[in-house]
Amino acid sequence: MSLKLQASNVTNKNDPKSINSRVFIGNLNTALVKKSDVETIFSKYGRVAGCSVHKGYAFVQYSNERHARAAVLGENGRVLAGQTLDINMAGEPKPDRPKGLKRAASAIYSGYIFDYDYYRDDFYDRLFDYRGRLSPVPVPRAVPVKRPRVTVPLVRRVKTNVPVKLFARSTAVTTSSAKIKLKSSELQAIKTELTQIKSNIDALLSRLEQIAAEQKANPDGKKKGDGGGAGGGGGGGGSGGGGSGGGGGGGSSRPPAPQENTTSEAGLPQGEARTRDDGDEEGLLTHSEEELEHSQDTDADDGALQ
């Protein structure tokens, strides 16, 4: 017959391994449930190293943390002796559990039996308060890397007229080159027109010189023709024949004049014809002089641009 060894009552070791493998059983009906019953229930999850039953709660000390967590998962919320058990890890206090009121020093001991209620609350309060008071491990601060400041040199704006002048000169050169190209083409056209005008003026001058020479060579013949015409109009056919004879004599002494001039001169008096010829000569001369002055001005402008 084998005797079952009871677990010890030691459940208050302070080493981390013992704390992490300890189970707290709350809301326990200790009037009906004994220490042996608690050991029987929790021994199926692993070896129970210690068990202590107190008024309304109990502690179960396992030798392995894995066994303690398995017992918490398996027995939490179980109804035992008409009360629902509140089981969790002793080293991890439940956040929603209210802290027990501390009793007076006279109520700590009740005869021979030691009151673990005050002991448990006071012990874990001190334990977690001590852990909270521990200063955390100082984390080494990252040394900030000093970056060299980039200094931007301040450049003062100096007002200078040189670039503006150069720009103006360049634009002037480009515009002047374009104008020179245009003027060269225009000058070429003007030159061709002037040559044509000059040739026309030369032809007109030669014609005028020819007319003037003819008039100086035969001034009497023209008067006779005029007199014969007048006599023929007043006296009849005899004087008309004389006028025709005079006209024939004049024709033999000089070359025949153009038909337009003879007809116009015959229809007009001698004074009016002469004034008309002089006016035509003066108009042609003034026109030719203006054209020559204009050609000289354009040649001077072309030379200045080149």
Swiss-Prot record:
Q: Where do the record's region annotations for Epitope (recognized by BKRF1 antibodies) lie?
A: 227-253
Tissues of expression = Expressed in heart, brain, lung, liver, skeletal muscle, kidney and pancreas. Weakly expressed in placenta.
Record's compositionally biased regions (Basic and acidic residues): 217-226, 287-297
User: What's any GO biological process attached to this entry?
Assistant: mRNA splicing, via spliceosome
List residues, modification Phosphoserine. Answer: S63, S106, S135, S264, S288, S295
According to its UniProt record, which protein family does this protein belong to?
A: Belongs to the RRM HNRPC family. RALY subfamily.
Specify the protein name: RNA-binding protein Raly
Q: Which organism is it from?
A: Homo sapiens
